[in-house]
Amino acid sequence: MGIRRLVSVITRPIINKVNSSGQYSRVLATREDQDKASPKYMNNDKIAKKPYTYRLFSILGILSICSLLLISLLKPFNGADAPQCESIYMFPSYARIDGFDERYTPLAHKYHLYLYREQSVDREPLNGDELQLDGIPVLFIPGNAGSFRQCRSIASACSNIYFDSNTRATLRNENVRNLDFFTADFNEDFTAFHGETMLDQAEYLNDAIKYILSLYERTPDYPHPKPQSVIIVGHSMGGIVSRVMLTLKNHVPGSISTILTLSSPHAASPVTFDGDILKLYKNTNEYWRKQLSQNDSFFSKNISLVSITGGILDTTLPADYASVEDLVSLENGFTSFTTTIPDVWTPIDHLAIVWCKQLREVLARLLLESIDASKPEKVKPLNQRLQIARKLLLSGFEDYSWMNSKLNYPQENLQEFSDNFFSDYATLEMNDVLDFEMFNLEKWHNNYTKINIPSNISSTEHLHFTLLTSLDMPMIYFCTESRVNLSCITAVDSILTVPRSSKDTQFAADSSFGEAKNPFKAVSVGKNILQKYDYLMISKPTYGEFSEQEGMEDNQGFLLALLRNVSNVQIVNTTPSQILLFGEQLHLDGKDIEQVISFSNLWDSLLSYKLETKIEASNEGIASEETLFQPFIRQWVYEPFESKWHLNIINKSLDINMHNVAPFIPLNESEPRSLQLSFFIPPGMSLEAKMTINWSLTLKMLFIRYRLALASFPVAFIALVLSYQFYWYNKTSEFPSFDSTLGYILRKHGILMFFTLFLASPVVNNKLVQRILYLLDPVGLNYPFLLSERNMHANFYYLGIRDWFMSTIGILFGVMTVGLLALVSKIFGSLEILVIFLQRKLSKKNTEDKEAFDTIEHKAYGKGRLMASVLLLLLVFFHIPYQMAFVISLVIQIATCIRVALLKLSNNEQKLNLLNYNMTLLLLLLFVSAINIPIIIVFLHNVAIKWETSFRSHHNILAVAPIIFLVGNNSIFKMPNSVPLDTWDGKVTIILFVYLTVFSFIYGIRNLYWIHHLVNIICAWLLFFETIH
């Protein structure tokens, strides 16, 4: 049963009950009856035909919305995407720094500064009235609606590691010192919604840093050179605030050189409700790019920016937004995912990223190993800091991780060995597997195994060495041999930690930090490094080394090594459309320990896949035997540095989702973007796998990336309907209802409209088209061609899609928008009927039907309404944001619609015109209010915390005055008169609504705030139109 029919079945008895008296039947015609209300109307334009197409699209749209909501809420994340954070505890204490008052910052009444101390571990924060500071200053910046207490987890871990002599001994830092964690209390400000709030925080924190450094200057017994800089740790929008700080006039030069951000949206603003936020992003990014482009600037030589994101579990902020690729080069920072970080290996949600046990241990070590108490800067040089960050935050398989590896620089790191050091060795030929196992050690009679690296073959293009072991520290030597001496480098710093994959592990985090099961170790070296050496020496492990491994069952210890000159990379050129139609069959033999499948055409973050794996039929018997390890997969992309680990994959269905090429996110188009799957397979085992599209996960992730479309798409459709309504109104003097007009559009132009929604994505992805769109962009804040010298490019238009295959999303969103608008419209219609019914029940008598209309119709704006409007504008000018006045206008428009519905008219056609006009305008204002409400939330929050300073932004009375006066006109039942279509007045009205439609579709998602201004301009025209006619 269609929605319209369902509403009719519910409401018809009420209408019949009211109409039973007879005398009011001519008065109570509603929009539900408009198909029968005016024969003349039907004969003129036939717009009110039964909209079966509209019903179909409405039902499909509502079903799509429900399905998407159910999938988003109910579908769990599985396997590598499942949350595995462990619980933590700490004993926090906070000392409020009251000395940082109005003498140092004008924002002291609004914000506060605290010093964190871990109870029973740290030094007491106060000695009488004086702060006790003996460490290195770190400033924690909370995010949107964040608390200063969120610093406690990382600060606690830093204190526990440093003040425990055993754990402090494991730090690779001779000049380590305890950390003094300062944290800012912003009273849970909504930073993401309001640019002025972000500026306030940045200004306050610059003053706070200046004050913090002065505290150390006044500390007489500080044991080291006085600090001249502060380490920054920012969560969410706090990371953006930290970047803004360096652009302000009150920034102390050199006071910030190390920034670590957690789930911070560097690449793009997560919301576009406020123009100030977008301008702040633009100005800050341009400042950073300019500074970093100068090789001799402080930024280039000192600033490090490391961004960490929780990946797929961050449903508050799309993980794609955490990329810093367009801001800093790899010499100054990078982006990593928590699924990539060794000993963490789990996705983390937006809030948990500040307290997750596994991650906080790594972050604490990163901070403690990056500092240098002997220097005033209190941090190591830039290249050393990034080397530490790469070691701790990347998997180690990335080429970027090898930048500072000792193996990469043999001339500087080779050590001389005596000729007889490796005297007891056996030689292993290339392509033969070295297989040390706990139960077969006796068959290996030599202490070392030598693997010669070929140098005289015609091509070593595919030369690679792979080692995988359960040992904690395998001994591997990369050696060069000359006539004079033997020189080698131990591969200690190149041994990588990978998750343990066995029958008793399900998730990568099962062998992460603090777990009973030890992870595996691996070495993966390519030709570029191997060609610098003559041979490898691998030490034979002892039985004791195997047996001492925690979580190791009998006979499970192993060490596998293999040198091959055969490519272990299989390139698959299958496209998403081919996977959709046929799937992709994969075959992996057991000839190599690590085999890589590179999907050259799979790079779109919007698509998720499902991978089903099984043992090849020819060797299924292996499944019942004890293998050295269970096959596992490292899923990865080149940049950003995201890796995921899928364990124990036999007979499993794996979810494959990546953060790669994403909507609206800048990327370097010269870098490879292929999805990579590295299979680690025991010798002799062959696997079969099939890849298909995972539609449920794809749809689940759509909502996270396109939440802003919930405002822009409905506004575009409503504006399109209004343009048609005014067209028919000017043509026939009949203003059709929203439902009938949308139904007419779908019936007459639905195929063209949805084809346009599909075709728009590949069209706006064209660079020539983007240049034209940028020239036509009235906002001008989103330049697609960011850094041409680095091939950095972004698609800010429409849905930001770069692949034609996902262009169908436009059609899906179009259908969902029709369903949403139909649902809202029917709710309004039902409320209208209910109001009429209640009015008839409560009213005792009805008089002067026509006279009442005539009196109101000729009524002037009135002094009372004029004074109320002027008073509201004065409030906007002096105190409240104009968004608040907009919502007040929305409430007045709702009241107007109710009053129009209750009118008793002899001329039913006039009432329908007035009702349809006001109802459609109400729909428009309702969805625009979704854009304005976040600013109101910020304003009310400031009122709640009794912040006395006025709301310094959004006091432009011109941004809301036309809306206020138009709604005031509507409240006295005025509406624009119909004019001939061939006049400029009629054309301008239609052109304005068409432009709003196009803008909302093409520019709307990334410029939501501008939609309000366009609606305001249209209201100004309608107000002028009503006045002159």
Swiss-Prot record:
Enzyme Commission number(s) of this protein: 3.1.-.-
Biological processes, Gene Ontology terms: endoplasmic reticulum to Golgi vesicle-mediated transport; ERAD pathway; GPI anchor biosynthetic process; GPI anchor metabolic process; protein retention in ER lumen; protein transport; protein-lipid complex remodeling; vesicle organization
Pfam families per record: PGAP1 (PF07819), PGAP1_2nd (PF25141), PGAP1_TMD (PF25140)
Domain of life the protein comes from: Eukaryota
Keyword Oxidoreductase on entry: no
Broad enzyme group: hydrolase
The protein's name: GPI inositol-deacylase
Keyword line: Endoplasmic reticulum, Glycoprotein, Hydrolase, Membrane, Protein transport, Transmembrane, Transmembrane helix, Transport
PTM annotation: Glycosylated.
PROSITE patterns given in the database record: LIPASE_SER
Sites carrying sugar chains: N19, N295, N302, N447, N456, N485, N565, N651, N668, N694, N918
SUPFAM superfamilies found in the cross-reference section: alpha/beta-Hydrolases (SSF53474)
Task of the protein: Involved in inositol deacylation of GPI-anchored proteins which plays important roles in the quality control and ER-associated degradation of GPI-anchored proteins. Required for the transport of misfolded protein to the Golgi, although dipensable for the transport of many normal proteins.
Spans through the membrane: 57-77, 708-728, 749-769, 804-824, 872-892, 920-940, 957-977, 985-1005, 1008-1028
Gene for this chain: BST1
Family as reported in the entry's similarity comment: Belongs to the GPI inositol-deacylase family.
Catalytic residues as annotated in Swiss-Prot or TrEMBL: S236
GO cellular component: endoplasmic reticulum; endoplasmic reticulum membrane
Subcellular location: Endoplasmic reticulum membrane
GO function term, MF aspect, one: phosphatidylinositol deacylase activity
Membrane topology: Multi-pass membrane protein
